[in-house]
């Protein structure tokens, strides 16, 4: 089960995230626990594999918002980086950046078990 201390170790700005949830720790942890199942991770990966930069941008931008709202800073930074590259339709190999994001998602999923 996920804890505030585990999230802090993970790189989340828990105090900021709790502030957005009006100090309701149970609500904050419940919302964070939904992140690994967020469908936009799959959409981002699939869009990149299909070289669909518009679809990848939409997925990354949505993830950026959710991760930012929950102050999952380490994940947010990775997603914000790829979002800006996709916004400008930068033609690069995104596979390493997507892998970093998916690894962070998987690490968070383990914390949520």
Question: What is each PLM-predicted segment?
Answer:
Residues 1-58, 62-113:
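Two-component system phosphorelay core
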């Amino acid at each position: 089960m996920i804890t505030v201390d585990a999230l802090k170790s993970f790189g989340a700005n828990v105090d900021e995230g709790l502030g957005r949830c009006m100090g309701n720790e149970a609500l904050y942890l419940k919302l964070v626990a939904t992140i690994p199942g967020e469908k936009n991770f799959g959409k981002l990966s699939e869009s990149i594999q299909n070289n669909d930069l518009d679809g990848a941008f939409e997925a990354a931008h949505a993830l950026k918002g959710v991760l930012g709202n929950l102050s999952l800073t380490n994940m947010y930074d990775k997603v914000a980086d790829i979002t800006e590259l996709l916004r400008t339709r930068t033609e690069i190999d995104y596979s390493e950046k997507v892998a970093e994001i998916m690894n962070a998602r998987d690490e968070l999923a383990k914390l949520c078990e």
